[in-house]
Amino acid sequence: MLTKRIIPCLDIKNGRVVKGTNFVELRDAGDPVELSKIYNEQGADELVFLDIGASHEKRDIIEHLVEKTADQVFIPLTVGGGIRTTDDFRRILRAGADKISVNTAAIHNPDLIKQSSELYGAQCVVVAIDSKRHYVNEEDLDSKQLEDKNVVKVDKNKYCWFEVFIYGGRKETGIDAIEWAKTAEELGAGEILLTSMDADGTKDGYDIELTKSISTHIKLPVIASGGCGAPQHIHQVFEYGKADAALMASILHYREYTVGELKKYCMDKNIPMRL
């Protein structure tokens, strides 16, 4: 059985790590280089570095910070935010990234996934999907407007489909997240980074229904993101959400747990982890 991965996430704004709730109300969480060093020493399996304002502000990613961060870590580093072209891929890989995460640009130009995969290998291409629940009334389930949507029953009498958002969660697309994940797989993506905007920063647990819906429709590894507030949430997203990796921020940035403590909890629940 493949080992599951614990991945700290560094959301960067103005050169600092920040954390918010539902993609807003950001507050400072520390220095990215220092935090990267700490998580590397604690035994994180990978790191994700996201320049969260780059796409919305239509600017390039902060390259020097990528270089400084890459100098401190000896585990795979995924970098995203403001990646628009295959040249951006090359530049950030040269700066020290092992994988590149694309989100907004891939929606506007899906061929970017294919071209980057062919140039640098599928293992370098991570497609990030920011998704939000779009609730549907039971009497509307047969509506023509839902013909291209994967409607999921998420509670006793609750139904929804999962909508893709871009520009750091600022703009809705009308695109179904399950269909977009399947398209990304067909185009040559190597991994999906799946964030629940509803759960983000709440610390109430991952969106299990969202994660499971994506994981069971594709063969690619799925990294679950958004909502981690306790070790049991990680166990749940592995066990019931069928995620391959769990991304987290607040729980680590504010020293509530170490990576090692989270891994031990999962191993005690018979989840295979790398020590």
Swiss-Prot record:
Catalytic activity: 5-[(5-phospho-1-deoxy-D-ribulos-1-ylimino)methylamino]-1-(5-phospho-beta-D-ribosyl)imidazole-4-carboxamide + L-glutamine = D-erythro-1-(imidazol-4-yl)glycerol 3-phosphate + 5-amino-1-(5-phospho-beta-D-ribosyl)imidazole-4-carboxamide + L-glutamate + H(+)
Residues at the catalytic site: 11, 130
Pathway noted in the entry: Amino-acid biosynthesis; L-histidine biosynthesis; L-histidine from 5-phospho-alpha-D-ribose 1-diphosphate: step 5/9
BP term (GO), one: L-histidine biosynthetic process
Upper classification of the organism: Archaea, Methanobacteriati, Methanobacteriota, Methanomada group, Methanococci
The protein's name: Imidazole glycerol phosphate synthase subunit HisF
Assembly and binders: Heterodimer of HisH and HisF.
Database matches in InterPro entries: Aldolase_TIM, His_biosynth, HisF, IGPS_HisA/HisF, RibuloseP-bd_barrel
Enzyme class of the recorded protein, top EC level: lyase
Keyword check for Amino-acid biosynthesis: yes
